[in-house]
């Protein structure tokens, strides 16, 4: 597995001072351009959750879709989209969450999760955990449960893993990068 993780990590380009000065952007689009790295990413996440009793997978807009959908296909599970406001056609419920400077909102179809669903949340990157926390609240409001969340990249210095663990959610990450 170390060869696969090395391939994944080396496939992620680091872009300094993007989107603003002092930030190092971890670009997963470079990973998706390398089929072996993309396949390894999907397979490692899928295998980590194959026997965890997951009933549905949620992907967060938009990069969570890139990894969540193929993992759902690999596991033969429904894939649920969590989107920004106004993007879903049926009845939705919304959840606000805090950003570094302001607030944002996520939505899910009101009929997407049923009572007792064991939901895995997938996103590309774990930073502060705010986006995933909003997803957890959406799932809980619909009667589902989130015990696991999966990410390609972890930025441990930003505390997202600890934030999720305090809510009883165990984060699974493939590669760590220092900083923010």
Swiss-Prot record:
The keyword Repeat does not apply. GO terms for biological process: adenine salvage; AMP salvage; purine ribonucleoside salvage. InterPro entries: Ade_phspho_trans, Adenine_PRTase, PRibTrfase_dom, PRTase-like. It catalyses: AMP + diphosphate = 5-phospho-alpha-D-ribose 1-diphosphate + adenine. Pathway: Purine metabolism; AMP biosynthesis via salvage pathway; AMP from adenine: step 1/1. It is found in: Cytoplasm. GO terms for molecular function: adenine phosphoribosyltransferase activity. SUPFAM superfamilies: PRTase-like (SSF53271). Coiled coil: none annotated. Homodimer. This is Adenine phosphoribosyltransferase. It comes from Actinobacillus succinogenes (strain ATCC 55618 / DSM 22257 / CCUG 43843 / 130Z). The gene is apt.
């Amino acid at each position: 597995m170390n060869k696969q993780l090395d391939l994944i990590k080396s496939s992620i380009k680091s872009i300094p001072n993007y989107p603003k000065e002092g930030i190092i952007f971890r670009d997963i689009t470079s990973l998706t351009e390398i089929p072996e790295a993309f396949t390894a990413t999907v397979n490692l996440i899928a295998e980590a959750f194959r026997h965890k009793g997951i009933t549905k997978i949620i992907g967060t807009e938009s990069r969570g879709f890139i990894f969540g959908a193929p993992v759902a296909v690999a596991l033969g599970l429904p894939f649920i989209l969590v989107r920004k406001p106004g993007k879903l056609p049926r009845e939705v419920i919304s959840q606000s969450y805090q950003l570094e400077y302001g607030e944002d909102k996520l939505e899910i179809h009101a009929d997407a999760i049923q009572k007792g669903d064991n939901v895995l949340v997938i996103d590309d990157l774990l930073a502060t955990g705010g986006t995933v926390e909003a997803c957890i609240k959406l799932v809980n409001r619909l009667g589902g449960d989130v015990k696991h969340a999966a990410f390609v990249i972890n930025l441990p210095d930003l505390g997202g893993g600890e934030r999720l663990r305090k809510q009883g959610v165990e984060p699974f990450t493939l590669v760590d990068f220092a900083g923010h």
